Amino acid sequence: MDQEIEIPSFFLCPISLDIMKDPVIVSTGITYDRESIEKWLFSGKKNSCPVTKQVITETDLTPNHTLRRLIQSWCTLNASYGIERIPTPKPPICKSEIEKLIKESSSSHLNQVKCLKRLRQIVSENTTNKRCLEAAEVPEFLANIVSNSVDTYNSPSSSLSSSNLNDMCQSNMLENRFDSSRSLMDEALSVLYHLDTSETALKSLLNNKKGTNLVKTLTKIMQRGIYESRAYAALLLKKLLEVADPMQIILLERELFGEVIQILHDQISHKATRSAMQILVITCPWGRNRHKAVEGGTISMIIELLMDDTFSSERRNSEMAMVVLDMLCQCAEGRAEFLNHGAAIAVVSKKILRVSQITSERAVRVLLSVGRFCATPSLLQEMLQLGVVAKLCLVLQVSCGNKTKEKAKELLKLHARVWRESPCVPRNLYDSYPA
């Protein structure tokens, strides 16, 4: 764009400072670009006007057609300067159109497929459409499709071989039915994820009055779905658990933890791996879930991930992994599994002072847990030889947080009789060993 062209200030969105493509008016009377104000209100979860700081009482956005036409005319007049005319935006979907679409979908499988494809298109257009879909109870509609489809291909008849059926025709029909159900499930799951459902709607899905247990359904998908659907299932499960009540989290079934660990093992996608770790962070503060997670092989999996440079190179991954290890090592089964892994002590010790303050604090807590409750002569010698004791002494010398220093000092004092006079502690660190 030529620098000599001056853009009228009222053409610019107060948030993005770019020319508005779809100007809309909020309840305070200020005009913004639709995409920017939707992101501010819905993704940012703010309820105030960025310009006036007044509370936005109504989230309905009124299109400013006059300003939009004025911007389009200005763009046309200045086309010779390389300014492109902004297209006329599509109007947001209305609730009646959504309800009609859902009603028509119940008439046949083909209409259901068409409905899901249309919903995907609607979701991709703008955030207002997403809120309209939510108001029309589309999340519940999609969850029911997913649940019913999963029940179909998980039904007992799905395990029958063709020899158990009356003839080959029946076998082919059954196979087609399962393929159709899986295809519907994959499409509905994708739309449900991209809908970016609000916290209120997520809670409604968790407490579905129609009896659909979405958590169980997503667990089954993580077990048997295609890679993309397994990833979406993990992402949705994380969102659901973030708004779940403590009792709902405590009552989670053992199978869920096994599938979460499998997601971590398969490394389906960066987002799926991150969500699986977040699920463990959300669920493992409760004792029952710690036992389930340990039985599912969580500790071994996390140690292996921490040894993987691709995973551990991201600070947040290392932090979450160490938080989960800390929680699991607070139970006896967790400490036993931790010590059963030959590289556990070395891997955890290596993360101290190398990633972040959170990682260092949690790593020291893990070492304190095993050092306090599982201190055998061989373990204490291993910690000496691996440089754990020297690392703990170093923690006392550097700036790394008072909590971390307190835990390190506690562990060093606990085994001072064995460690204090050891030649494995470098002389430059010896003076920091607590008395």
From Swiss-Prot:
Its EC number is 2.3.2.27. Pfam families: U-box (PF04564). Disruption phenotype: Increased tolerance to drought stress. Induction: By cold, drought and salt stresses, bacterial elicitor flg22, and bacterial and oomycete pathogens. It catalyses: S-ubiquitinyl-[E2 ubiquitin-conjugating enzyme]-L-cysteine + [acceptor protein]-L-lysine = [E2 ubiquitin-conjugating enzyme]-L-cysteine + N(6)-ubiquitinyl-[acceptor protein]-L-lysine. Auto-ubiquitinated leading to degradation via the 26S proteasome. This Auto-ubiquitination is repressed by the bacterial elicitor flg22 thus leading to a transiently increased protein stabilization and accumulation. Keywords: Cytoplasm, Plant defense, Transferase, Ubl conjugation, Ubl conjugation pathway. GO terms for cellular component: cytosol. It is found in: Cytoplasm. One of its GO terms (biological process) is protein ubiquitination. SMART domains: Ubox (SM00504). Changing residue 13 to A: Loss of autoubiquitination and increased accumulation (at protein level). Increased levels of EXO70B2 (at protein level). Residues 6-81 form the U-box domain. GO terms for molecular function: ubiquitin protein ligase activity; ubiquitin-protein transferase activity. InterPro entries: ARM-like, ARM-type_fold, PUB22/23/24-like, RING-Ubox_PUB, Ubox_domain, Znf_RING/FYVE/PHD. Changing residue 40 to A: Loss of autoubiquitination. E3 ubiquitin-protein ligase that negatively regulates water stress response. May control in coordination with PUB23 a drought signaling pathway by ubiquitinating cytosolic RPN12a. Acts as a negative regulator of the immunity triggered by the pathogen-associated molecular patterns (PAMPs), in association with PUB23 and PUB24. Regulates EXO70B2 ubiquitination and degradation via the 26S proteasome to attenuate PAMP-induced signaling. Interacts with RPN12A. Binds to EXO70B2. This is E3 ubiquitin-protein ligase PUB22. It comes from Arabidopsis thaliana. The gene is PUB22.
